[in-house]
Amino acid sequence: AGKRFAWMGLWTAWISTAIGFYYAVVTGWCLKYFSAAASGGLGQGVDTTQVWNDFLQDPSQVIIFQFLAVVITMAAIWRGAKAIEKVNVILMVSLFILLFSALFLSILMDAQDGTLDGFVYMFSIQPEYLLEPQTWISGLSQSAWSCSAGMGMCITYAVYMRKDEDTTLNAATMCLANNSISIIAGLTVMMAIFSVVQDPLSAVSGGSSAITFLVLPEVFAQAPGGPVVQLAMVTMFFLALSFAALTSMISTIELCVRNFVDHGVDRSQAVGFTGGALFLFGLPSAALWILMDESTGVAFPQFLEVQDHIWGYGLMFSGLFIAFSIWKYGWNRYKVWQDENDIVGFNWQDYLDNGVSSFRDDFINTGDNDWWIGKWWDYIMYLGFPIMFAILMGSYFVDLLLNVDNPWDPTNPKGITIVLLFWGVTAIVFLFLNRWLVSRPLYRNVPEGAEVPIDTLPGGEDDMILQLGEVWTGGNLDNSSESTVLTAELA
């Protein structure tokens, strides 16, 4: 997008990292419940509300499991791309096996009365919810999070890809796999709940945390087959949930680590620094502002929920900034085309032919992709996305103003002021850091054997972008960084 907009990249990296601060706490919850399930602490007759309240209101327990989640994540990414690939292969294969096993048991449970009402509810449509802005906002945020859309994940992992990688097929496969797993997980949960809970609609309306940590342990404790099957089912579920959380943590934190590495920081130092920050900045979400809902008697982490609200919705701006870089690239290519052909003045048709389609032609339809992407992609990117973004964000803020008491009160965790304050301060700080960002070199890591000259890659002719192993001799860095030389990670 240009050097003036480097702060947008920092925003994208920060949003992902900020989500990681509190997501490490959530991952710790999953690990805690897996250990409790495996030891028989979530069996029949256990008061799951009491288990949840005791755990959440004991900061030492929450922090211990948060620390464990951080350590596992840092260990997985310490050695770089190959280690990440091996860990993810093990975790994802295990996740599939565990999830399908739990789905099979849930189908048996739901089919006992011959109705499959959990399956029916899962795919039933309630038109009134389609008219609520919150439905679409939540759906977009969930999609952005689960597919890593707008988080810069694919941009980060691109440094490990071959030049001839079929990114189109990979993106389609990723979305298909993600949505398939989401449907399978939803079916597993819904069919299990509807099979044993007397008031399933009340159970599923309590939110994802209530369903996961309060309802499901009770549901699995009543599964047919006796104590052995019940223990296996609840243990498998929370082990699968822990694996899913850890894979998300790995990709989220690798984004932060990789950005440090690209700016010349040794990987071991980047992992150590990021791990320390992840733990320290996650402590407030683990221990602060733990409240009790008087109507239900269930504890909830108010500080964590506020952070999730702020940075989760901030993902939409990350997506906007990435889209902006595509728009800017198209405009720059159009101006270059004008200069090369001595054309003066703006022409819509010329812009559509030589500007709008340029990103698709240069980076998507490279000749290495099996699925050719047509002009429909341009319409979605240039028209569909900005219109959708404007409508959803406008609806979101209108909904806050109309349906939240005292929305302008900065102490209101559900108000509009606290969201704008966090977003605004973050954007201002990053704008001030923009000059510092563009004065530092970036180190490009071409995998061994790729044999791709750096000047043939996008941005390779920029004197601020160096091949891994080259020495930076510029004068804008401090003395400790003037002669940074990095060694390849991908041996």
Stretch-by-stretch model annotation:
Residues 23, 73-83, 104-116, 131-133, ...:
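Transmembrane helix-loop junctions in multi-pass membrane proteins
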Residues 1-11, 24-81, 112-137, 210-213, ...:
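Inter-helical loop and helix-membrane interface segments of multi-pass membrane transporters/permeases
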